[in-house]
Each structure stands twice: as structure tokens, then as C-alpha cells.
Amino acid sequence: MRKLFLDAFKHEKLEKPPIWIMRQAGRYLPEYRAVRSKFENFMDMCRNADACCEVALHPLERYDLDAAIVFSDILTIPEAMGMDLKFIKGVGPVFSDPIESEKDLNRLKSAEDSVGDLEYVYNAVRTTKAAINVPLIGFTGSPWTLAAYMVEGSGSKQFSKLRKMMYANPQLMHALLQRLADITVIYLLEQVKAGASSLMIFDTWGGILPLEQYKEFSLKYMEYIAKNVKQKSNVPVVFFTKGGSNFFEELKDKSCDGVGVDWNVTLDQARHRIGVGKVLQGNFDPAFLYGTSDSIRNTVKKNMEFIQSDKLNNYIVNLGHGIYPDINPDNVKIMVDAIREFSV
């Protein structure tokens, strides 16, 4: 197995930085769309281990990447807890029965009763792991991000229902977050047992919070998960809070091994705020892949020259968020090939 991706977490000198791409198995690839068309709804596809494996392999077959990520969705946990999840075209994920009260919280299944309903995810991990020669990344949404959809009922620009609960009924908010954190620990450990070599916690909506609320309602539970997972496994764990660069100083002493960095902060700023103890992952703007081949190469050159000058060995090349569905796959190859021309 190629171990460059895992070697980055050892803080040893590497000849070149590892590469993978958030949402690398996704709608921008025609072969993904062909597989997706065979399923009436998205979750049916997620429950098919062979389909999950096939789409996870597509980017590895096209590009020289150093890791795969299991094909799944962050909302598998709320659905396993008994919530009614539907993916509506043009809207996205929708829960018809959002959490509004303690009564709603009490109707959710326990962690122990929920994990069995997630066996299809572990099957996807096992099937994919057997088919690849690179490390496999398992993942979850952060409790705060899962709660955002569970309370709001869908995605939102303001998440006013979620934030109202946080301020008006913090006890209920914490009770929900703790329930989610407990099941997430089991969920991630099961992914490790099935073959995941690294784990990532996607805190997609942590960036909407003020600092003190971020520490209390988001980071606290990510840290709880990482601590408990690492007590029973030795796989690296990466935190990624979208729009969270203002919170980087809070991560210095946390249990994560790496930090995802978006494009709103430079790598040197991120390193200064986080310190040398964490691997940095990122931070190309996904939109730069809309550019010409020359502009893509020039952007790569600027970033990689910084990495060379800083001897930034604990660094993983990635986008600052998921790749957009209308990106030209050929431009991804230009990016990957340009990165491969550089050594640390």
C-alpha cells in the first residue's frame, strides 16, 4: 500500500506532499453520474457497497492520488437514529420530522440501537479497502453539523432554528449534541475496524458560530469524539471547520492530528495560528479549477513554492472544500500533474 498520505502524519521529511481531493468521487465525473443514474435515490446508492466501491475507484483511476475516501454521506447517523431523510432535487437533504423539543429527542434511537443500521457503511469501507492500494479515509459530520440539519430540517442560509435552540434552550442542544457524539465514536471505530486508515470530521457549519459558542457547541464535541476514538485506535484524525480560520488557535492542544484549511487563509497564516504539531490539509480554492490550464499551473506553482521554502513536510494537498460538480475533470488532472512536478 502507498503510505505517503499516512507518512505526512508522522512529521517526517517527505520528498513530495500527498494529494487527495474532497468530494473526489462526485458529480463532476461522468462515470460517477453513470453509476448514480442506476439508483432511484441517493441513499439507495450509498447502501450498495459495490456501487460505493466503484465510484471511490473512479478518481484513483483518473488521477495520481494518495488516498481514497469512503463513499457515503454525513447524514447516515441521523437516519439511523430514526429520522426520515429524503434527498429532494434542487433542495438537497430534508428531514420531515425535525428536532424541536425534548419529546422529539427522546424518540430517537440510542447509539447502541443505531449502529447496527449503519452496517451498509462498514460494508462499503470493507469492499473499497479490498480494492485499493492507498489509505482509505473514513468520515463523519461533526455533531454540530448533524444537528444543524436535524433541527432545521434542511440546509439553510441562517440556521435560525438551530441557533434559536442553542441560545433559548442550551440544555436541549447539548443533550442532542452529546447523543450524536456518543454514536459518532462508535461509528468511527467501526469504520476503523472495517479498514479505514484515517478519519475526518467535517464541521461544515461550525463557521457560523461566534468563538465562544464554537468552543462550547462544536469543538467540545469534536474533541470528545477524537479523544474517545484515539483511546481505542491509532489512526490519525483530521478536523475541518468550513470558515473556521478564526478558531485555529483553539486547535493547538486538541486531539486531532490534522486540520483542514479553507482558502480564506494562507498556509503560512494557518501554520502560525495552529503551530507545528498538526498536519495542514488544503487549501486551494475549488473555483481555481475553472481557470485555464496556465492559470491552474500558476496557482499550483505559488502554493508549492511556499511549501518548498517552508519545508512544510506535515502538509496534505487538497482543496479548501469539496470540488464543484461542474468542474472539468481534465482540469483536475492538470492540477494533480502540476503538483507532482514539485518536491518538498
Swiss-Prot record:
Catalytic activity: uroporphyrinogen III + 4 H(+) = coproporphyrinogen III + 4 CO2
CDD domains found in the cross-reference section: URO-D (cd00717)
GO cellular component entries: cytosol
Pathway participation: Porphyrin-containing compound metabolism; protoporphyrin-IX biosynthesis; coproporphyrinogen-III from 5-aminolevulinate: step 4/4
Similarity annotation: Belongs to the uroporphyrinogen decarboxylase family.
Pfam families in the cross-refs: URO-D
Keyword Cytoplasm: yes
Subunit structure: Homodimer.
Keywords: Cytoplasm, Decarboxylase, Lyase, Porphyrin biosynthesis
Function: Catalyzes the decarboxylation of four acetate groups of uroporphyrinogen-III to yield coproporphyrinogen-III.
EC number(s) given by UniProt: 4.1.1.37
Protein known as: Uroporphyrinogen decarboxylase
Coiled coil spans: none
Binding site for substrate: R23, Q24, A25, G26, R27, D73, Y149, T204, H321
Main location: cytoplasm
Sites annotated Transition state stabilizer: D73
GO MF term set: uroporphyrinogen decarboxylase activity
Subcellular location: Cytoplasm
Repeat is among the record's keywords: no
GO BP annotations, alphabetical order: protoporphyrinogen IX biosynthetic process
